[in-house]
């Protein structure tokens, strides 16, 4: 049986490929052989939960945003579901980063999306009553159980 891609499995488009088709420009600094100048209204170092969300808000406000990340950009279809490959591609120090005293390993992301890319498997669905409370109390939009179902 042929491997299905993300769109076939989930019925939604890959967010990275969708972003690129909507005008994202991606550059790999490792490909540069000489210095280059990039212009932006805002430069954000790190593309994890904080940097990524901040970039989206600023871009929607009309600012030109430059995201700078140490690791690679991976599309959903780049994931092979192989831990050994993920360690070298997605983690700081091939998942070998340790606390200063060596007592604890630190599983820190090194890719576009940061540690959120590797921690998504420990995310749980927000209870429906919590989503409803947020909607009633804080007038949130787009976060009903049905609207969140694809994610």
Model-predicted segments: where are they?
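N-terminal glycine-rich phosphate/pyrophosphate-binding loop and immediately adjacent elements
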Residues: 9-146, 150
């Amino acid at each position: 049986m042929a491997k299905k891609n993300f769109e076939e499995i989930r019925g939604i488009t890959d967010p990275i490929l969708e972003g690129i088709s909507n005008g994202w420009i991606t550059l790999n600094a490792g490909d540069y052989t000489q210095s280059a100048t990039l212009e932006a209204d805002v430069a954000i170092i790190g593309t994890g939960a904080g940097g990524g969300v901040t970039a989206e808000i600023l871009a929607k406000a009309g600012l030109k945003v430059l995201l700078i990340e140490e690791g690679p950009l991976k599309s959903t279809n780049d994931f092979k579901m192989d831990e050994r490959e993920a360690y070298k591609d997605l983690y700081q120090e091939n998942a070998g980063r340790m606390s200063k005293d060596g007592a604890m390993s630190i599983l820190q992301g090194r890719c576009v999306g940061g540690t959120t890319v590797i921690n998504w498997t420990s995310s749980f669905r927000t209870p429906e009553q919590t989503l409803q409370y947020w909607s009633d109390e804080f007038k949130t939009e787009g976060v009903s159980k049905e609207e969140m179902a694809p994610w």
